[in-house]
Amino acid sequence: STAGKVIKCKAAVLWEANKPFSLEEVEVAPPKAHEVRIKIVATGICRSDDHVVTGALAMPFPVILGHEAAGVVESVGEKVTLLKPGDAVIPLFVPQCGECRSCLSTKGNLCIKNDLSSSPTGLMADGTTRFTCKGKAIHHFIGTSTFTEYTVVHETAAAKIDSAAPLEKVCLIGCGFSTGYGAVLQTAKVEPGSTCAVFGLGGVGLSVVMGCKAAGASRIIAIDINKDKFAKAKELGATECVNPKDFKKPIHEVLTEMTGKGVDYSFEVIGRIETMTEALASCHYNYGVSVIVGVPPAAQKISFDPMLIFSGRTWKGSVFGGWKSKDAVPKLVADYMKKKFVLDPLITHTLPFTKINEGFDLLRTGKSIRTVLVL
């Protein structure tokens, strides 16, 4: 048995920004109290991982990225009660401690134990790391770090799921799908018959489209500058697709003309401040709701006309789709098993873990929606 011992395994280490991932042998320490060590089976490539590579999201280096995954518990530290070796799990970049004000509130989901701040530590709760490589300490990423054969997470940052679930599919419930789907159902609470606009048609944006359809929206306007994304958006429920490049005027004016007075709900699923204000301006001046789903770039500030808000609009943010992670993830997996939603259309590529750099190239060139790496 490997329990209680250091495991040597393969991991993709990012030594510095704007460099390819380096496949290295790393040492993964055993889990401490309240921690679990997980054998990662499948992990998705999300734009937020790439934001660290480009420097748009500030993280301490060197680091093992990856946060959208599924795996099996290899061993548990002392005092762990809810998980045991052999359990199928999804790591949670938004943990659920069950004790902080966000966890205790019916309205909240962003647990205080998260490492998503503008100055992340990249460390476990005790201020240390479980990864070393070539004698150097390697940082964790938002409490998950899934671009490795083995990782260690806090027990509040792993959800036990149905062991029959296909891990190479449900790994998307660890981020992309849940983030988009929940932004509609949990954060915006879209009503039947509504008109919605979705800015950005990557994996998360398409999950927003699916959420709008599930909520009964009558018009779902999908917006992207890459027209190759439109067929998939329509397949998943978009009623119209708009390419801002086809117009001389700002996209919020186009949407206002298309809908009369603006959409009921808009979703920014890109992470650009320009599209955040466009999305806000495109919703109804008095009762429109706009939700920021894309991770905002580090150190950039928004300036906008406050009259956009004064007239009655609501501007909201949504992290992990507003779901209380440990409670919701097992239910979302169960819903997937009951065929209440699909994940296959989001997964355009499945690659062996060693081809991680190729997977990121597919993302950057707009050729993929989700690439799943199989370990």
Curated annotation (Swiss-Prot):
Gene3D superfamilies to which the protein is assigned, alphabetical: Medium-chain alcohol dehydrogenases, catalytic domain (3.90.180.10), NAD(P)-binding Rossmann-like Domain (3.40.50.720)
GO terms of molecular function: all-trans-retinol dehydrogenase (NAD+) activity; zinc ion binding
SUPFAM superfamilies: GroES-like (SSF50129), NAD(P)-binding Rossmann-fold domains (SSF51735)
SMART domains, alphabetized: PKS_ER
Chain residues that bind NAD(+): 200-205, 224, 229, 293-295, 370
GO BP terms in the entry: retinoic acid metabolic process; retinol metabolic process
Protein's cellular compartments: Cytoplasm
Enzyme's top EC category: oxidoreductase
Cofactor note: Binds 2 Zn(2+) ions per subunit.
Family: Belongs to the zinc-containing alcohol dehydrogenase family. Class-I subfamily.
Organism: Coturnix japonica
Binding-site positions, Zn(2+) 2: 97, 100, 103, 111
Residue numbers binding Zn(2+) 1: 46, 67, 175
GO cellular component annotations of the record: cytosol
Cofactor dependence: Zn(2+)
Subunit structure, as described in the record: Homodimer.
E.C. no: 1.1.1.1
Keywords attached to this entry: Acetylation, Cytoplasm, Metal-binding, NAD, Oxidoreductase, Zinc
Reaction it catalyzes: a primary alcohol + NAD(+) = an aldehyde + NADH + H(+); a secondary alcohol + NAD(+) = a ketone + NADH + H(+)
PTM annotation (N-acetylserine): residues: 1
Protein name (database record): Alcohol dehydrogenase 1
